[in-house]
Amino acid sequence: MRRSVAGIALGITITVAAPLSVAQADTGSSSLSGGTGSSSLSGGGGLPPYSQWITEVQTVAAQAKDYLAGRLPGATRPAIVLDIDNTSLETQYNPGPLTPAIAPILQLVQWAKSQGAAIIFVTGRPSLMNLYTQTNLTAVDYPVDGLYGSPLTTLSAGSAGLEEYKTNARIDIEGDGYTIVANIGNSPSDLAGGHAEKTFKLPDYNGKLS
């Protein structure tokens, strides 16, 4: 992607480094429980059980597919932007070194890719995790046409800094000639700031699922 090498301010450069705790990386301010490799399907910390969460995710994924089925045909260089933790990967409910895909989102993304959409991830995880993150995404069968990781300074700036970084990433994607037809995330900072035709919000239970 244009500026993907030089755009260090957006944290796009893929760097080989030991990964940080995945559960701490995509929040900008808070950490998640778990991270030991054991699943927490019963929820905890005020979260609902996995069965309720995945049902709610499936509802949003179906809404997104209905919209994209009408929008993708004829779109010029369509792209879908996604957050990663608890949007694309089951970071809270199934933490571990290789985090499983969220099945309804994976199915949506694979279908959209087959319809000609580029799949671009914009995550709050620091850019030094990009290689690790991309390896996880591809291992669970996500297509990856682009991956933006945040500068380390973003994590210390809280949700406002995360929102600014993610907005700038979408501006950069548009600068590469893409039309962002959908932006999917589970936190307000994933979706605020515009530069997407439509947003789809997955549950975050008032910030408890970051």
Predicted regions, residues:
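Non-catalytic pre-domain segments flanking phosphatase-related domains
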Residues: 2-82
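C-terminal cap/substrate-recognition subdomain and adjoining C-terminal extension
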Residues: 26-27, 34, 130-210
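Second-shell loop/turn segments in exported
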Residues: 46-55, 93-99, 120-125, 156-160
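Solvent-exposed, polar/charged alpha-helical surfaces in well-ordered, non-transmembrane soluble domains
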Residues: 62, 66, 103-110, 131-135, ...
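Sec-exported extracytoplasmic/periplasmic mature domains
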Residues: 69, 73, 110-118, 127, ...
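Surface-exposed patches in mature extracellular/periplasmic domains of secreted proteins
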Residues: 73-79, 119-125, 149, 181-184
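Asp-based phosphoryl-transfer active-site loop
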Residues: 78-95, 121
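Short, acidic loop-to-helix structural element flanking the phosphoryl-transfer center
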Residues: 95-119, 127-131
